[in-house]
Design a protein with these regions (language model features):
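Intrinsically disordered, low-complexity sequence elements enriched in Ser/Thr/Gly/Pro
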Residues: 1-2, 36
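Sec-dependent N-terminal signal peptides of Gram-positive bacterial secreted proteins and lipoproteins
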Residues: 2-21
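Bacterial extracytoplasmic/cell-wall-associated proteins, especially those involved in peptidoglycan
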Residues: 25-155
Length: 155
């Protein structure tokens, strides 16, 4: 009787371990899938943000700070309730970025724009979250900072 009980316990443990191992394998595969999607999303956002930064502030005379501010405004818009929820939707939102319709967005970004886009995607916006406008004139509720000929303004 004791032998049977021990044998049943051993079998239950084996089945339990097999089930646990199967669940772990499934969880690992799911995690790999999530990581792959995050990698794809990062690459897509890097492409979009580096092209936007280059098109809006990629001239040699533009400072690195201005490039960071341009990218930060786009990232802040993703977080703000008045704008779309993805970087792609923010950039392609009708009437927001002239570089979309004038063709400048499609130009290959310079190395500085790519480097700064990576910095921003990995470290986040360098501006307060309510700074969601950039233009050569003041918009929204006021100017947070002016960099060169660009005003960075709050909602």
């Amino acid at each position: 009787m004791a032998r049977r009980l021990i044998l049943m316990l051993v079998l239950c443990c084996m089945v339990s371990n097999t089930t646990y191992a199967s669940e772990q394998l499934a969880m690992n595969e799911k995690q790999k899938g999530i990581e792959k999607l995050q990698e794809i999303e990062y690459e897509k956002d890097l492409y979009l943000l580096s092209h936007l930064i280059n098109a809006e502030a990629g001239s040699d005379w533009c400072s690195d700070d201005l490039m960071r501010y341009v990218g930060s405004v786009a990232l802040n818009r993703v977080q703000h309730q008045a704008f779309p929820d993805s970087l792609e939707e923010v950039i392609y939102q009708s009437g927001q970025y002239a570089c979309i319709w004038d063709g400048n967005f499609d130009k290959e970004p310079c190395e500085r724009a790519v480097r700064i886009a990576k910095e921003l995607l990995e470290g986040g916006s360098v501006l307060p979250v309510d700074v969601v406008f950039q233009a050569e004139f003041i918009q929204g509720s006021g100017c947070y900072i002016q960099e060169q000929n660009t005003y960075l303004c709050t909602y």
